[in-house]
Regions:
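Acidic, low-complexity, intrinsically disordered interaction modules
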Residues: 11-71
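Short, aromatic- and cysteine-enriched interfacial helices/patches
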Residues: 12, 39, 82, 86-88
Length: 88
């Protein structure tokens, strides 16, 4: 199982990975502040943050869970736990 992933946002502080996203962009949420969600794209020397609505983040996380279940992924329990802690 892979370890948790964190990033530091210049304004909102620590973010943790909620779900992998599409096109190399992952979904992160604020760790300490009010729940805000970001679509994060990491390129060679730059990190791009795009604020996304709660329902979009939840939908993407649900799609990731379905994909992990279909594939029988070893990380399924990790994503289920993160989904429960973040959205339920």
């Amino acid at each position: 199982m892979s370890s948790e992933r964190y990033l530091n946002h210049p304004t909102f502080g620590m973010l943790y990975q909620v779900s992998p996203g599409n096109d190399g962009r992952d979904i992160y949420a604020t760790l300490y502040a009010q729940k805000m969600f970001f679509l994060v794209e990491i390129k060679q020397r730059e990190v791009f943050f795009e604020v996304i609505p709660y329902l979009d983040a939840r939908n993407q996380a649900e799609l990731n869970l379905q994909k992990a279940k279909r594939k029988g992924s070893e990380e399924l329990s990790k994503w289920e736990n993160l989904f429960t802690q973040t959205f339920l």
